[in-house]
A protein has these predicted regions:
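FAD-dinucleotide binding site
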Residues: 1-415
Length: 415
């Protein structure tokens, strides 16, 4: 087995890891960025499509007016599209009348006010306890939770949900969010197809045992998803039970996408959307003609996404077609064809989509983010106090971890 030595090793080449590696490189610190996959980006992944790039992972630059990926993408020569998202325009909603759309919007806003108020209480609780008993819109509000948090409201901490900081401005990268994030690794020393199996702290240096050999370092930054950390306690030697427990309180919810081609696309308004149903939680949300392209981006979350993932692309497609037929009639089935889907739960290096604190576990984010021995640092969206579940939240925790690592290795340098 080979042996390599660096000042800092960064484990995981998603938004957090790439951000950390770039910061360390710019500071002149010898750094290796290690990634288990054969590609960069982590849960940010853009793939080619017949009508244009498709973001299989994150696609929206949330809080875009303060999202660092917007200026990064533009500096790369990519195009940031500032068209407002379909969920921000009532006129973009297909299949739900103006009156019903307004009623649902009001119900959702009322629920969010209840969340903010309840978060001030001394005791945390599950968000489903704030739904108005018998309200017609409860199922759809719960469905929104599966897209927003990746889980139904009974598994969402009110306190954590209220802490999420969203400016309400949402943009996209025409060439793909995943493209921008992967490009930001340019110039970094990267080892792909390299799984970190153990991080041993028993010596003067850290010893990382990987599938591509042993790596020693003065410090390491771990950016692995919370589900991976929760399910592989053997990663750390000696064990870090506080980290394992914190990660288990921040499980990754599930949101999966299916892209479909659409014939006769001009019948739909650009950037419009439709709910598959308004009277049940197990439904998809469909984005028609993103960027004006002749396609549909279908989004499934929570328990529904987990069930469909077991059946692969065909199951996602069959479910979507059934909802389309109920909305637009039987002839619509002939107008769509599946292009690409990905199941994030079955992805061994993700095991889900984005983190959501369980009721009573909101403070786990700070525990997960805390350094160990001033040489083992943690980053990733689950470590963000207010921007969790986003690529910019992950990136900013990566920068913070890198700054701590830079200070640590400089403080330990002789002379």
């Amino acid at each position: 087995m080979s042996h390599q030595e660096f000042k800092v090793v960064v484990s995981g080449a998603g938004a957090a890891g790439i951000g950390a590696a770039r910061r360390l490189r710019d500071a002149g610190v010898a750094t290796l960025l290690v990634e288990a996959r054969p590609r960069l980006g982590g849960r940010a992944w853009t793939v080619p499509g017949p009508a244009g790039p498709m973001d299989i992972g994150c696609g929206w630059l949330h809080s875009a007016d303060r999202n660092p990926w917007a200026p990064i993408a533009e500096a790369q020569g990519l195009t940031v599209d500032r068209t407002p998202p379909p969920w921000g325009r009532a006129s973009s909603l297909v299949g739900l009348g103006a009156r019903d759309g307004a009623e649902f919007g009001a119900a959702l806003q009322n629920f969010r006010r209840e969340v903010d108020a309840a978060a001030e209480a001394a005791t945390d609780r599950a968000a489903d306890s704030l739904l108005r008993p018998g309200d017609h819109w409860n199922h759809l509000i719960d469905a929104v939770s599966t897209w927003y948090s990746g889980v139904e409201l009974d598994r969402v901490s009110v306190r954590d949900l209220a802490r999420y900081d969203d400016s309400g401005v949402n943009w996209r990268v025409v060439e793909g969010y995943g493209t921008a994030i992967a490009k930001h690794a340019a110039g970094a020393d990267v080892q792909l197809d390299c799984v970190v199996q153990r991080i041993d702290r028993r010596g003067r240096q850290l010893r990382l045992e990987t599938t591509c050999g042993v790596i020693t370092a003065d410090a390491a930054i771990v950016t692995l998803p919370s589900n991976v950390l929760a399910e592989t306690p053997e990663l750390f030697l000696p064990a870090l039970p506080d980290k394992t427990e914190a990660a288990s309180g921040l499980p990754l919810g599930l949101a999966n996408k299916l892209y479909l081609s659409l014939s006769g696309a001009d019948e739909f308004e650009k950037e419009s959307r439709a709910f598959g149903a308004s009277d049940r939680t197990r439904t998809g949300v469909y984005h028609f003609r993103p960027f004006g392209r002749p396609m549909i981006e279908a989004f499934f979350g929570g328990d529904l996404a987990a069930e469909l993932e077991k059946g692969g692309k065909e199951a996602f497609f069959d479910f979507a077609v059934a909802e389309f037929v109920s909305l637009f009639g039987g002839d619509f089935a002939r107008r769509v064809k599946p292009l690409r889907a990905h199941g994030w739960r079955g992805d061994p290096f993700a095991r889900g989509s984005y983190s959501c604190a369980l009721p009573g576990r909101a403070d786990c984010r700070a525990v997960l983010a805390a350094p160990v021995e001033n040489r083992l640092f943690f980053a990733g969206e689950a470590c963000s106090a207010t921007d969790f579940s986003t690529a910019h939240g992950a990136y900013e925790t990566g920068l913070a971890a890198a700054d701590r690592a830079i200070a640590a290795v400089r403080a330990s340098a002789p002379g």
